[in-house]
């Protein structure tokens, strides 16, 4: 089996690329970073530090790389069996024209073997969005062929891969946590379902997408925002602060009550999942900075994201949300010289006041009780 993976960054190398290569798949990375491309093509291997209670160093081997903006990547798309991405939500639109060109070439060469494309991004139904961009870039006469022969498979991914300075200045070395989860929608594949260790197949993807968003992402963000307010440097420092831990755990339990109601998750198993995530935040080997995790607060306070979406669920089912509200208030306090969204947030609150600013960012009704609760919590933490 041959695979092409867009994005040779930390997540590409430390998570998806590693799983594919470990499964014996012939893997080529596509990226724009020439230093990384040259290193991959010189060595065809790299090291992954898996850190947790049992630290280990795994070597990923047998890999190649091409530029994601050259002709080589188009040629590859005409022949591979699987395309994956870990480029970041914003970049999906940029790689779509190359994918479209490759699909046109595949059709012209009469390659009718099924091809599946899986975007492994921190977003809901990212592959469906990528499909929209690819379809827009395709000529009309190729669209029906693509619909017939190409599967666009949505997925949910979860592994913490913080930026970490390599002791050896190796551009390929990467550090990851032990935990990883890659869940894909088996109803969207063309042809036979792949058997890749570490890839889980489900016919109810949204349950797992929201479980991750409402638990890991919600908890991670609230830990970062409360941690920043309290002067902590890392996620570990923040979650070991008992007052922060109580709010984070409480928020994950509140969002969990929504998941249990909506999808029928088992309450005891979900409680264990929350404990596992708290343990991941405590990992002493992951130097995960609160500033990094908290960045882009406008996106994280938007209606479909990790803070407001679970809150809307509590309103839908008439469930408590006191800790989620504290997390939202802390997010409104996030300030960072490095992050344009943090500056935009601060300017908006200064200009309009917290009530109107939160309503504008989140889509919540400015006159609702829950916005009043958030503003009270915001004012109480000044």
From Swiss-Prot:
Gene, per the UniProt record: mtlD
Single GO cellular component term: cytosol
Single GO MF annotation: mannitol-1-phosphate 5-dehydrogenase activity
InterPro entries, per the entry: 6-PGluconate_DH-like_C_sf, 6PGD_dom2, Mannitol_1_phos_5_DH, Mannitol_DH, Mannitol_DH_C, Mannitol_DH_CS, Mannitol_DH_N, NAD(P)-bd_dom_sf
Name of the protein this chain belongs to: Mannitol-1-phosphate 5-dehydrogenase
Annotated residues for binding of NAD(+): 3-14
Enzyme class: oxidoreductase
Reactions mediated catalytically: D-mannitol 1-phosphate + NAD(+) = beta-D-fructose 6-phosphate + NADH + H(+)
Keywords, ordered alphabetically: NAD, Oxidoreductase
Cross-referenced PANTHER family: ALTRONATE OXIDOREDUCTASE-RELATED (PTHR30524:SF0), MANNITOL-1-PHOSPHATE 5-DEHYDROGENASE (PTHR30524)
Gene Ontology terms describing biological process: mannitol catabolic process
Family: Belongs to the mannitol dehydrogenase family.
